[in-house]
């Protein structure tokens, strides 16, 4: 069970098409994957380097083996598994943390303000804000910094979280 991070993205632009594009990304169930696509783990064989990662005893599969999607009513037995060992393929976890900044997709996405020149989106992420996703948004849409917020496209990202007995926040400009 993660600690949740509440994220807010605000976009201001005189280009309504860019506003619509960003809105469309966050109307999907997988906005992070839309911006930074996750590999298809069923097509990527295990390597010597990834064979024992996160495993303290037996390897998760065989070198060169690809995982398969297993369906099961029990959620602990469903998902990507290696046929030779029936162990879970958890390579997604490190990849997502490295490439999205968090282990899961955005959840509880809400478009809280939607005008022709302003968009505000809120969502939650597990443990931490999706900083790499924010950087891709800024780069893809050529966002201005805070001093130039009234020209072109300006995007601000804020996040808030609570840990036992303390609160934290941050922002990217």
Q: What residue ranges belong to the model's regions?
A:
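Long, contiguous binding/interaction regions
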Residues: 1-173
């Amino acid at each position: 069970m993660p600690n949740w991070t509440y994220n807010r993205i605000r976009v201001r632009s005189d280009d309504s098409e860019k506003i619509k594009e960003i809105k469309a990304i966050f109307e999907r169930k997988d906005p992070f994957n839309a911006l930074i696509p996750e590999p298809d783990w069923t097509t990527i064989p295990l390597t010597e380097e990834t064979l024992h990662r996160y495993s303290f005893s037996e390897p998760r599969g065989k070198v060169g083996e690809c995982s398969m999607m297993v369906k099961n009513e029990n959620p602990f037995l469903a998902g990507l598994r290696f046929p030779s060992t029936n162990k879970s393929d958890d390579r997604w976890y490190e990849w997502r943390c490295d490439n999205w900044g968090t282990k899961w997709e955005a959840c509880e996405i809400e478009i809280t303000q939607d005008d022709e020149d302003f968009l505000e989106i809120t969502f939650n992420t597990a443990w931490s804000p999706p900083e790499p996703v924010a950087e891709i948004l800024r780069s893809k849409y050529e966002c201005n910094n805070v001093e130039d917020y009234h020209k072109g496209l300006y995007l601000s990202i804020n996040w808030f979280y609570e840990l036992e007995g303390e609160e934290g926040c941050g922002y990217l400009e």
